[in-house]
Every structure is written in structure tokens, then in C-alpha cells.
């Protein structure tokens, strides 16, 4: 069973997202029109899927691999340099090269950024292997590496040629990784009331990993993101900002833990709860709404407990570095109801007072 949908960005060419019930890498062959292929993956995914992927490629291609260490802390300049050096050392050229990102969000982000900057832009293909990367980072063209002072601070908007994925990847995905991915899925429920109701009525099947339900879940999640990206590909109008619900707080958590604590999806889960509580603090929603929204997050196995190893001063400093901020104004994605999120400016003083009472 294959589900296919199209992403139509504002400025870039359209591309397909292919969600498969089985794992059949041959579906991407029609998109590999280049003769030089560099497969970027990590040590974990390489052991599981690299051999099968390489076997699916035709014989007349010049195929090389670049295997990075696994973990958010390796979404770095050093890893980027390794990819670029591999391309240069093997004389890969702009018009004959395609990069393939075989892995989760870190691999997709760093490979996409390498594609964006190598010889001013080469083709790349996304093969996301985690639930989180399937529904979020592989769609929409955000590519980046981290800086020691902040997450995703060095990057570009650059769209893939195609996204291919399969729910069969879940067989080798830990329960922790699966639940981390569910946080990004739940994020879309706060953006779309229809999806909120669908998730609510299909919770048991989702937690039981029913294959038909999961394909529909991934498809619906990608559709919501694709619709937003079509309106505001490069975050010029502010429409795309709602996709960052939970991320302002979440990114700060990751930064404070040096990307070695909570996984990205876990941090987003906590971040959404923080954004919900901040919305209540500001009077945008009632106490009962805040409880209902947080209970909805928790009902999918997602923890909303704030880590106890984070210093409030350091956390506040990390939030001040958020990319949405401008002219020293703090900007947050806040909630007024299901399907009603908005980008709002708040003062540093308001945030400090909220953090004081919420810790």
C-alpha cells in the first residue's frame, strides 16, 4: 500500500512524499537521474538499512557513502565538513550529483544543508527513518546544523527532490523514538481541529501501531505541514511560524542539556506543555482548557515533565536566542483554542514571571 502527496512550496519546485507500507527502495530510482550518488547516514541506520539501499541502486552509478556518528550533538560543523570533504575528494560535480539522506532528522537536516551549499546547490533525496523525521523535518525544506550557542542557527531553506519513507522503519525504532515522533504528530492536532478529532478517535490503533492507521497518520501530518509550507515557504509572512508550536521552549531545553538529554521530540512535548501553560498564564485559555490540552499530549505516552537539571537563568538565556525573536522582542507560538495558534510578542519580564511561578 502506497500513499502519495505533493508539496507545493512558494518559491521552489513541487515534489512528492511517498509513504509505503513495505520498504521498497526501488521507488526512488526514477528520481536518481544523476550518475554520482553520495549516501549520508549514521552508524545506527547504516547497520540496519545501508546494504539494502545500496543493493536497490543500478550498477552504472558512482555510489559513495558518508557515515556519521548518531546523535543530535553530531549535527555540527565537523559532520558537515566530513560530507563536503567526501564530495570534493571524489570529484562530485554540481550537475551530476545527488545526495541521499538515509536516517532521522539529524541526517536529513545536515544532508540537506550540505546539498544547499555544495557548489551553490545540488539535488538531494530524503529517506526519513524515524516517525519524527517522516512527519516533520523531511518536509518543508528547512536544513541546518547547530552552533554551540543555539540549535539550527546555521542553515538554509532547500527542498528535496523527493521524500520516500515506509512505516516498516518502525520495526527497528525504539519505543522512546516512536513516542518522541508522536510529539510532532500531536503538534499538528493543535494546528488542525479535524486532525485533533481524528487522533482522538484513533488513539488506541496508533499506540498499537496499526499499519493502515499509521500510514493515514503520517499522510495527514504531512498534508498539514505541506499546506502551511505552500503559504509561507521561507517564513516571510509569519504563517509558517505555527509549525514551531512547542519549539521555542523545546529548543531551549535541548540547548541547556547540550543536546545530550531529551530527544528533540521529547523536548517538543515538554515545550508544547510550557506554551500551553504560558498561554493560560497570559489569559488566552482557561485553566480547564490548559488541563485538557496537556492531558491530550500525555494520552499518547508523551511526558510533559520539565527537566529538573536545567538552571532557570541558563534556560532564559537560551530562549533569548530563538530565531523568531527580532529587535530584542520575544516571540512565542501561543494557543487560544484547538486550531487557533498565533505568533505573539511578549516581554522578557512576562516570561521571567511565568518561569518563576511554573518551576
UniProtKB/Swiss-Prot annotation:
Which residues belong to the signal peptide in this entry? Answer: none
Record GO cellular component, one term? cytoplasm
Record-listed Zn(2+) binding positions = 184, 247, 264
**Residue positions binding NAD(+):** 70-75, 105-109, 129-130, 142, 151, 169-172
What is this enzyme's EC?
4.2.3.4
Write down the chemical reaction(s) this protein catalyses: 7-phospho-2-dehydro-3-deoxy-D-arabino-heptonate = 3-dehydroquinate + phosphate
Which Pfam family name is an example for this entry? DHQS_C
Q: Which InterPro entries match?
A: Dehydroquinate_synthase, DHQ_synth_AroB, DHQ_synth_fam, DHQS/DOIS_N, DHQS_C
Q: Which GO terms describe its molecular function?
A: 3-dehydroquinate synthase activity; metal ion binding; nucleotide binding
Subcellular localization is given as:
Cytoplasm
CDD domains in the record, alphabetically? DHQS
Superkingdom assignment: Bacteria
Q: Which keywords fit this entry according to its UniProt record? A: Amino-acid biosynthesis, Aromatic amino acid biosynthesis, Cobalt, Cytoplasm, Lyase, Metal-binding, NAD, Nucleotide-binding, Zinc
Cofactor(s) needed, names only, are: Co(2+); Zn(2+); NAD(+)
> Which pathway is it part of?
Metabolic intermediate biosynthesis; chorismate biosynthesis; chorismate from D-erythrose 4-phosphate and phosphoenolpyruvate: step 2/7
Q: How is the cofactor bound?
A: Binds 1 divalent metal cation per subunit. Can use either Co(2+) or Zn(2+).
Gene Ontology terms describing biological process: amino acid biosynthetic process; aromatic amino acid family biosynthetic process; chorismate biosynthetic process
Family designation: Belongs to the sugar phosphate cyclases superfamily. Dehydroquinate synthase family.
Primary role = Catalyzes the conversion of 3-deoxy-D-arabino-heptulosonate 7-phosphate (DAHP) to dehydroquinate (DHQ).
HAMAP family per record: DHQ_synthase
| Protein name, UniProt field | 3-dehydroquinate synthase
What organism does the record attribute this protein to?
Answer: Francisella tularensis subsp. tularensis (strain WY96-3418)
Upper lineage: Bacteria, Pseudomonadati, Pseudomonadota, Gammaproteobacteria, Thiotrichales
